[in-house]
Each structure stands twice: as C-alpha cells, then as structure tokens.
C-alpha cells in the first residue's frame, strides 16, 4: 500500500543477479547474455532492495554468490510453506499471567516459528487468553480469583467458540504463568481439544521442541502412611522437602512424589519426554484413587516446567479422578499457600 494514501500499488521489481547491461553491477561477459531471461538469474524484490542490489558502489557487499544464496533461501521457505497440507492448520493460543513482578513475554512470531514445518497458523493473530495490564500480584488472594475467572471466560468466548464453529480443530498452546493457572488451562483444554503444548527453553532460548534423545527416568514414590489427606509433590524443576508440605497440611498427610534424579528447570527438552511424563501423571492419578479411596482429599504441590503443568491438567479426568486443590510457593506468603 502507498504509505501516504494507503491505496494499493505494485511495488515489486525483477532484479538481475548478473546484470544484463555492461555498466550494471555484477556484469559477466560470459554469463550475463546467457542468463538475461533465465529464472535462476532473476529475483522478485521490493523497491528498496532493487535500488540496493543495482547500486554499483555496493557491488562488493552484494556479490552474485550472496544474492544467489538469498534467492535460494527464500525460495526454499516458500516451497516449504506451499507444501503444507490443509489439515496442518492450527489455532495458536497465547496465555500469560503475571509471575511475581514479571509480566509474561509471549509473542505471535515466536510461536509461528515453533509451529513450522509441522503446522502453520490459521490466522495472522493468536487467540489471546491473557488478562492485559493486570496490577494484581500473585501474592494477593484477589489475583487468583481475577485471573481464574478471566481465563475461564476468555477460554469459553474464544477457544470453545472456535471449536464449535471453525473447521480447524487443532490448537498450539504457548503459556507462561504461575503453575496453578497453567494446570487450570490444562483442565479446560482436557483431551477434548487436539493440541500441542510448547515449552519455552532457557538454553537455547526457544519455543521449538529440541531433538533430544536422552530418556528421562521419572521416579514415583508412594507414601509411607495411608491417609485420606493426600499430597502429590511434583518435584521436577526443583527439589521440594516434605517439611514444606507437612507445615501446611500436617504430619498425617500421605505424600506421593513424582521427581527425577536431578531436578532442574530446563530438563524438559523433547516431545517424547513430555509424552512419557503424561503417561506418568495418568498412572499416578489412577494409583492415588485406588489406594486412598474416592473420598480422599488431594493437594497438589507443583514445581515443574510450564508444558508439564498444562499437560498435568489435560490428563486429569473430572468425572473419574479425585478433585484437587493446587498450592503455589511464594516467599511473601511464607512458603506454599492454597490458590485454586
């Protein structure tokens, strides 16, 4: 569009890699006449690039080899995108909530890069479930009430509405929020919504799943006592002592543990590792209900990656599994406290 009038206009040019004019940049006495109309020597470019590539003074900065690589890289991208099948469309969901003093850095472009080449976005914008410009802090009780209601309402208005009315039924989820809210998002998605959940890695800093081959040994420990008061400690991102749980629930609590040999915050690297963790979560839900009964109280103490928290909520079956209460660690509150 014209920047002044916003009217539609054609701003494209055909540029030559090897100039057809003897006075042009990168002119080659042998190649230029042969390749004057050859597609391998032509580039479709904008006005700015056309002027740049045709500037004789910039010829050393833009030799033929560089332009050929730029042309090939772009053509490879176009070939990749046009080869994607229609059933590979996906709705991008972005959900962020304030964590302590930090807001959630979620960007549509970063999400798109993580999708390709397996899926590509349905629209040029995402389904946003975040509460914008929230002044509440996660140490405030009001924070949890407001964030939970906002998440449920926006999920119903946008995600549930899309599932009921759109032909595309796949979702790609990018979320950064306190773990109780991530688990809640997972319970809303459940397995009713076909979805891929993405993890923000620290090193390298990317949403792309990595091709890690290392298998994770998920360790499950059952409680020494059989109690109707049950805690599930998920110590994957960090270690969590039993005392931090019994100080909240009491010494008569049966504590189940899901952990790994060396908990740390960047262990989850691949889809396969997340798939195995889902299976572990599902088995533990079944075992807790079987060993403690349907009338047991279940309390969740999570320390896990964001994708794991969402998947934990997804595998929970509201009609079959025990209802649970989720706790969050906060120094301002003196440790774990009840949230949702």
Regions found by a protein language model. Give the residues of each.
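Gly/Ser/Thr-rich loops at beta-strand to alpha-helix junctions
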Residues: 50, 172-183, 235-241, 299-310
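Histidine-centered nuclease catalytic patch
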Residues: 2-43, 53-64, 68-70
């Amino acid at each position: 569009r014209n920047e002044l009038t916003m009217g539609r206009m054609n701003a494209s040019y055909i540029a030559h890699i090897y100039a057809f004019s003897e006075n042009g940049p990168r002119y080659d006495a042998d190649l230029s006449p042969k390749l004057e109309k050859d597609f391998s020597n032509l580039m479709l470019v904008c006005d700015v690039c056309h002027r740049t590539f045709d500037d004789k003074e910039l010829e050393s900065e833009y030799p033929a080899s560089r332009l050929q690589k730029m042309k090939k890289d772009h053509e490879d991208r176009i070939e990749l995108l046009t080869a994607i099948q229609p059933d590979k469309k996906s709705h991008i969901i972005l959900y962020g909530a304030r964590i302590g003093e930090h807001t959630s850095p979620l960007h549509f472009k970063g999400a798109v890069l993580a999708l390709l080449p397996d899926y590509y976005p349905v629209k040029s914008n995402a389904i946003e479930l975040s509460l914008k410009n929230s002044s509440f802090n996660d140490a405030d009780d009001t924070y949890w009430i407001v964030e939970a209601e906002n998440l449920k309402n926006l999920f119903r208005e946008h995600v549930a509405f899309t599932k009921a009315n759109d032909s595309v039924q796949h979702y790609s989820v990018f979320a950064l929020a306190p773990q109780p809210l991530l688990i809640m998002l997972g319970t809303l998605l459940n397995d009713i919504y076909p979805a891929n959940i993405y993890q923000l890695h620290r090193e390298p800093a990317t949403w792309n799943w990595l091709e890690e081959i290392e298998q994770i040994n998920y360790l499950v420990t059952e409680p020494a006592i059989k109690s109707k008061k049950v805690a599930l400690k998920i110590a994957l991102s960090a270690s969590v002592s039993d005392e931090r749980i019994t100080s909240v629930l009491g010494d008569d609590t049966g504590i189940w543990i899901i952990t790994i040999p060396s908990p740390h915050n960047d262990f989850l690297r691949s889809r396969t590792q997340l798939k195995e963790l889902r299976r572990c979560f599902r088995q533990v839900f079944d075992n807790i209900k079987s060993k403690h009964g349907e009338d047991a109280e279940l309390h969740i103490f999570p320390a896990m990656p964001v994708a794991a928290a969402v998947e934990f909520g997804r595998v929970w079956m509201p009609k079959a599994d025990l209802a649970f209460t989720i706790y969050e660690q906060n120094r301002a509150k003196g440790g774990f406290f009840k949230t949702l």
